[in-house]
Regions:
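Charged, terminal alpha-helix-loop-beta segments
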Residues: 1-204
Length: 204
C-alpha cells in the first residue's frame, strides 16, 4: 500500500520570513512569487509586471510595499500590494486607500496572516461602491509542508470584487446625472478622511 504524506500548516510564518519589510516583501517581489499571487487573484501566472518595491508616495514620506502593472492593461493599470504580518488593522486599511489614491492604482491587494471580519466588510463595501474599475482584494498568507519538504506558500483570497453585483447595483449607486448619491459620497468622504487622520497621527 502506498504511504502518503500529511499536510501540515506552519503556524509561525516568521520562522520563514523573520520580518514583513525585510523578508516577506522582497520575497514576494520576485517574479516567480508574484506569479503565484497573480494566479491566486485570477490574473494568470504572467498577469503582474513588477514596477518597484518601497515605492514613494508623491508629496509624503510614505512608501507603498510593492507596485505592479497588470500585464497588457495599459500604463494606468497599476496594482498596489500592501503587506502586513499578524491581524489586519485600521492603520493598514487607511494606508491602502491613501496609497491607491496617491499612486492612482486601479487594483489594491492587502495581504496579511488574518484579515479581520470588519476589514473584509469594509473592502467588500468599497468593491460594491466602485464604478470606475477600481478593485480591492484581501488575501491571507499561509505556509504548508508535507513531512520534511520545503515550505509552500498559499494565498487564500478572502475578499475579491463581485463584478456581477457591481453591474447590478451600479444604477442604484449613481444618481441620474452619473454622480454618486449624497449618501454614498458622504461614506466615501468619511473613509478618505479616516485614512488621512491615521496618516497624520503616525509617529506621534
Amino acid at each position: 500500500m502506498t504511504t502518503l504524506g500529511r499536510l501540515e500548516r506552519i503556524d509561525r510564518i516568521r520562522s520563514i520570513w523573520p520580518g514583513e519589510e525585510s523578508a516577506f516583501t522582497p520575497w514576494l517581489a520576485k517574479d516567480d512569487n508574484l506569479a503565484l499571487l497573480s494566479s491566486a487573484i485570477g490574473f494568470g501566472p504572467e498577469g503582474l509586471e513588477h514596477l518597484g518595491t518601497e515605492v514613494p508616495l508623491p508629496g509624503s514620506g510614505y512608501h507603498a510595499d510593492i507596485l505592479c502593472r497588470e500585464t497588457g492593461g495599459g500604463e494606468d493599470a497599476l496594482v498596489l500590494i500592501e503587506n502586513q504580518f499578524g491581524k489586519s488593522d485600521h492603520s493598514h486599511l487607511g494606508k491602502i486607500l491613501t496609497y491607491a489614491s496617491g499612486l492612482k492604482a486601479k487594483t489594491v491587494v492587502l495581504i496579511g496572516e488574518t484579515i479581520r471580519a470588519e476589514h473584509r466588510a469594509a473592502l467588500d463595501w468599497l468593491n460594491g461602491l466602485s464604478t470606475d474599475g477600481c478593485r480591492f482584494f484581501a488575501i491571507e498568507i499561509e505556509l504548508w509542508r508535507i513531512g520534511d519538504s520545503l515550505p509552500a506558500p498559499r494565498f487564500n483570497v478572502v475578499v475579491e470584487p463581485n463584478d456581477w453585483a457591481r453591474r447590478a447595483t451600479e444604477a442604484r449607486i449613481l444618481s441620474e446625472d452619473g454622480n454618486l448619491t449624497p449618501a454614498r459620497q458622504m461614506l466615501l468622504d468619511y473613509w478618505t478622511r479616516f485614512g488621512e487622520l491615521l496618516d497624520s497621527r503616525k509617529g506621534r
